[in-house]
């Protein structure tokens, strides 16, 4: 009997708020390098979802498609603006994939929660705890300031790291390595190379 490997699914929640304008080029370049590395990786396929968010909209750009079909970011399709409804973006995105198992959920933001209307931190924490405990999800939170660390802790995400906005390329290289580890072993780690 051949044992079927589990399907790998990465959900990437990317901040597209106004404060990301200062690192827009590095964010685009870093994301595109991450995408290239994951498309070239040998082995099992990777189901990928990308959600971009700001206070004007939460855009589900890709939902559970093969990563090889994901297009690069550029100046026309990544346009930072508005405020940071972080909890709404996280809560709604988790609910989108509520029945999926073994999801690797990555949050990249340079700011902290300042505009959510639907979700509070406590509700997001309950969702995260349920997904980790009952569905095998893993969460990685990458934030650029002290406030974002508080945000990660307030919703129970233990694996959180500081993003250096002046070196987004290195951040995405570490994310790519974490995704590769997830694809290879079903587990994640994140090495802060500083």
Where is each model-derived feature located?
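Acidic, low-complexity intrinsically disordered regions
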Residues: 1-194
């Amino acid at each position: 009997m051949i044992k079927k490997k589990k399907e790998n699914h990465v959900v990437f929640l990317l901040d597209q708020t106004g404060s990301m304008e200062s690192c827009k080029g590095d964010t685009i370049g870093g994301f595109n390098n991450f995408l290239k590395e994951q498309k070239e990786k040998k082995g099992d396929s990777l189901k990928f979802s990308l959600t971009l968010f700001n206070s004007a909209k939460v855009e589900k750009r890709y939902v559970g498609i093969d990563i090889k079909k994901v297009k690069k970011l550029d100046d026309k399709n990544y346009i930072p603006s508005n405020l940071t409804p972080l909890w709404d973006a996280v809560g709604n995105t988790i609910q989108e994939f509520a029945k999926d198992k073994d999801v690797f959920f990555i949050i990249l933001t340079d700011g902290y929660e300042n505009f959510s209307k639907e979700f509070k931190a406590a509700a997001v924490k309950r969702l995260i705890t349920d997904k980790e405990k009952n569905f095998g999800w893993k969460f990685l939170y990458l934030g650029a300031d002290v406030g974002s660390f508080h945000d990660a802790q307030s919703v129970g995400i233990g694996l959180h790291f500081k993003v250096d906005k002046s070196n987004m390329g290195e951040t995405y290289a570490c994310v790519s390595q974490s995704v590769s580890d997830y694809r290879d072993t079903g587990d994640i780690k994140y090495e802060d190379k500083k």
